[in-house]
Every structure is written in structure tokens, then in C-alpha cells.
């Protein structure tokens, strides 16, 4: 029989690596609470038109990368979400969440894109994102950038650069688009096949080309920022001023356009040189027209998403210290006949918030194994203490508490007094 394995580019996340994911997620939840962002969870399957309408029909995601299929029950076209912003906006519109004012939301979860797997790019990947909906001011742009910047500090990440640009408003983009097309048409011999295909449908995306042969051409192209009106420029200047006041270092990247068509005004990316071609770890911007495009009443919004796999890879590259939670205690049980008393004791400790790992029997009917092997496993578990439930101790209604990591001598404690020990243990974490 053929061995069944995971789909290429869709990876299992196993212990102990999963502990790194939990550590990152816990850091994010704590930080989001400080900024008053609340969690939202949306389905991983959405109607295909949501992404076609929201992301743009001529984007790479919609044209090439979506996992789409027909529902066998009703013929509806469905898609595994390739990103989360469109789904969050759909939920906000469907449930009239902005009726009483703006909302700050965050999400975590898997996304899906049909592309060639490589380092930092997978078919199932995970994103964490923040969305501030209903806030028109430049201060909302700045705050959400500051939120991401604060996260890097919380995680201990270094050498992450912030790049900014402004895409202006639709009328400004139309003027720039005409100038850009006219410029590119003068250099048709330099354009690659993809650029020629995009020339009249989505020329702005040509500026984001990775083709080395087109870099000089792109560098000389008309800059969108030179077409911005006074209001757009003032919005951008306010964002930059707030970042400057907070000591956030940034650089202007006039070629930064992002991969979805829904952006306007501020766009940004946090990038690193340590992950090769997949150097963008977080990106986002303002999307004031997406809510209306999806069927809601016009409302402003701004947000970002980070790639979890890329952030964890960068943490590994920088050898950042990632806490790996271990049990507080490991129960050493020499005799299986003591298991009823032992397990009742461990349940009481767990109810008090103590994390306890219990040694299991080696095999059915073969006992609990030697004390030496149990202590070896206790030490390997990373637990701070071993709780030794020996026959002599249990006869006295006691247990031996042996430090494995902390300083101090082992001591015998009455089972009835373990509640006091548990309280002391928690206060010393």
C-alpha cells in the first residue's frame, strides 16, 4: 500500500517546533491587546468572486495562484483563501460591524496559494494580520505601522527595514498610469512577456518586476509620488512625521506597489536581507475603497499581514531566544500500584495551574521502568522539578521534590501540603 504523505508545500508543524509558533502567537496576542485590537476568525473557504472583485482580476494571485473549485452541491465557485483581508472585510460588511464606529481587528491562520514551494514560500502558509477599519486619518496608518514595529522589538528581531510609498488616490493613479504606459511603450524591446501582457491592464505591477534586465528601465519610469495632489501628500507627510517622532527609521521606495489592487495612499513593507528573495516579512497599506467594492457602505481602512513562516525563519537566522515551554514537574513513579494516588495528586496540582508530565509505563504489563531511566527522561523533558512517588514516601503520605534546574536541595513534602508548594512555584516563574 502506498504511503500517504502531506501535499508538497503544505507542512506539518510538529513539536518541539510548534512551541516556537505558540510563543510567537502569544507575543502577538499580548501586543494586540495593548493596542486594543480584537480577534476575528473567518472561514478558510470563501466565494471566489470575493477575491476576484477585492484583489483585482489581473493580479498574480487571482490569475495564477488561487485554489478554486466548484461546490458539488450547488455549483457555487469557491476558493481557499489566498489572503485574509478580503474575508475580514466581507465579515465586517455582512455583520454591519461598523454601525457604531471603527473597529481594530487582528487574525491568525492558514492561507493557500498554488505556487512552486521554496524557502519562505509555501502552498499552505500562515499569516498574522491587523486591520483598522473605519479610521480615515493618517494617524491610523502610522499607528498600525508602529504596531508592527513594536512586534519586532517584542520578538527580538533586528535588521528589519521599513520601506514606504504612497499610491495616492484613483484620479492621481490614472494620470500616472497614462504617463507610465507612454514611457513603457517607448521601450517595448526591453519589456519581457509578462510586462507586455500587463502593459495596458495593470502597468503599475511592472514596477515590481524581479527581472534584472528591466531594472534600469523601471528605475527611470515616472514616479507615482510625483503625481500626488496636496491632500495625498499631506496625508503621507503626517504618517512620516509620526514615525519620525517615534524614532522609526524608514526609507522611500517609489517602486513599492504591493500585490493587490485594493490599496491607495500609504503602502509599506518591512524587509530583511537575511531571507534571500523572500525578504518581505510584513506588508500592508490603506484600502479606502475595498469595503464599498465588496458591497458595503464606503468606509476607510488600513492594515498589514506578516508571514509567520518567514518571521520564524528570520528568528532562527538571527538566533533569537525563543522560549520553549517545559513542564514545571515530572512525576517519577517506581511502582505502578501507586498510580491511583499519583494521578489524583497530579490532577490537584494541574487544577492549581502547575504543569506536570507523568512518566508512562514502558509497555503493557512491564511496569514503570527503572528509577535511573525515569530520572533521565525527567531531565530530558526540561522540567524544573522531579516529583518522586516512592513506596516509602507514599507510606508516609509524602512525595520527594527534587530540583532539576533550580538551586536547592531535594526535600520531602506531605501530599497534603503540595498546594503551598504549587503556590510558591507559580510565584517564582
Curated annotation (Swiss-Prot):
Quaternary state and interactors: Homodimer.
Catalytic activity: tRNA(His) + L-histidine + ATP = L-histidyl-tRNA(His) + AMP + diphosphate + H(+)
Cellular compartment(s): Cytoplasm
GO CC list: cytoplasm
Keywords carried by this UniProt record: Aminoacyl-tRNA synthetase, ATP-binding, Cytoplasm, Ligase, Nucleotide-binding, Protein biosynthesis
InterPro entries: aa-tRNA-synth_II (IPR006195), aa-tRNA-synth_II/BPL/LPL (IPR045864), Anticodon-bd (IPR004154), Anticodon-bd_dom_sf (IPR036621), His-tRNA-ligase (IPR015807), HisRS-like_core (IPR041715), HisRS/HisZ (IPR004516)
CDD domains, alphabetized: HisRS-like_core
Coiled-coil ranges from the UniProt annotation: none
SUPFAM superfamilies: Class II aaRS ABD-related (SSF52954), Class II aaRS and biotin synthetases (SSF55681)
One biological process term in Gene Ontology: histidyl-tRNA aminoacylation
The keyword Protein transport is annotated on this UniProt entry: no
UniProt key word Lipoprotein: no
Top-level taxon in the UniProt lineage: Bacteria
Enzyme class: ligase
Protein name per Swiss-Prot or TrEMBL: Histidine--tRNA ligase
GO molecular function: ATP binding; histidine-tRNA ligase activity
The protein's Enzyme Commission number: 6.1.1.21
Family: Belongs to the class-II aminoacyl-tRNA synthetase family.
Amino acid at each position: 500500500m502506498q504511503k500517504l504523505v502531506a501535499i508538497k508545500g503544505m507542512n506539518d508543524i510538529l513539536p518541539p517546533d510548534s512551541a516556537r509558533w505558540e510563543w510567537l502567537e502569544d507575543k502577538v496576542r499580548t501586543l494586540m491587546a495593548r493596542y486594543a485590537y480584537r480577534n476575528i476568525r473567518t472561514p478558510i473557504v470563501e466565494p471566489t468572486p470575493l477575491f476576484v472583485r477585492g484583489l483585482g482580476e489581473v493580479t498574480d494571485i487571482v490569475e495564477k495562484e488561487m485554489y478554486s473549485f466548484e461546490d458539488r452541491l450547488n455549483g457555487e465557485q469557491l476558493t481557499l483563501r489566498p489572503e485574509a483581508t478580503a474575508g475580514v472585510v466581507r465579515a465586517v460588511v455582512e455583520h454591519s460591524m461598523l454601525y457604531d464606529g471603527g473597529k481594530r481587528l487582528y487574525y491568525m491562520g492558514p492561507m493557500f496559494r498554488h505556487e512552486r514551494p521554496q524557502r519562505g514560500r509555501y502552498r499552505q502558509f500562515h499569516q498574522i494580520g491587523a486591520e483598522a477599519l473605519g479610521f480615515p486619518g493618517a494617524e491610523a496608518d502610522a499607528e498600525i505601522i508602529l504596531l508592527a514595529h513594536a512586534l519586532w522589538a517584542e520578538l527580538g528581531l533586528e535588521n528589519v527595514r521599513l520601506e514606504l510609498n504612497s499610491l495616492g488616490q484613483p484620479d492621481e493613479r490614472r494620470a500616472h498610469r497614462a504617463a507610465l504606459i507612454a514611457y513603457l511603450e517607448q521601450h517595448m524591446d526591453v519589456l519581457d512577456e509578462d510586462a507586455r501582457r500587463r502593459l495596458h491592464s495593470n502597468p503599475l505591477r511592472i514596477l515590481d518586476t524581479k527581472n534584472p534586465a528591466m531594472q534600469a528601465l523601471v528605475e527611470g519610469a515616472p514616479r507615482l509620488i510625483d503625481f500626488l495632489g496636496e491632500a495625498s501628500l499631506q496625508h503621507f507627510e503626517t504618517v512620516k512625521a509620526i514615525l519620525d517622532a517615534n524614532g522609526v527609521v524608514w526609507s522611500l521606495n517609489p517602486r513599492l506597489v504591493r500585490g493587490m489592487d485594493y490599496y491607495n495612499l500609504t503602502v509599506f513593507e518591512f524587509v530583511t536581507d537575511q531571507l534571500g528573495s523572500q525578504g518581505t516579512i510584513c506588508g500592508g497599506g490603506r484600502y479606502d475603497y475595498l469595503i464599498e467594492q465588496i458591497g458595503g457602505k464606503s468606509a476607510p481602512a488600513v492594515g498589514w499581514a506578516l508571514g509567520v513562516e518567514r518571521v520564524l525563519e528570520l528568528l532562527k537566522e538571527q538566533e533569537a531566544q525563543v522560549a520553549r515551554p517545559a513542564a514545571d514537574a515530572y512525576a517519577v513513579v517506581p511502582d505502578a500500584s501507586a498510580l491511583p494516588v499519583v494521578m489524583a495528586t497530579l490532577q490537584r496540582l494541574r487544577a492549581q495551574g502547575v504543569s506536570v508530565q507523568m512518566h508512562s509505563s514502558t509497555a503493557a504489563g512491564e511496569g514503570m521502568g527503572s528509577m535511573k531511566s525515569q530520572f533521565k527522561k525527567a531531565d530530558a523533558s526540561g522540567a524544573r522539578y522531579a516529583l518522586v512517588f516512592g513506596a516509602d514516601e507514599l507510606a508516609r503520605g509524602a512525595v520527594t521534590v527534587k530540583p532539576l534546574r533550580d538551586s536547592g536541595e531535594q526535600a520531602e513534602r506531605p501530599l497534603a501540603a503540595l498546594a503551598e508548594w504549587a503556590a510558591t512555584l507559580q510565584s517564582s516563574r
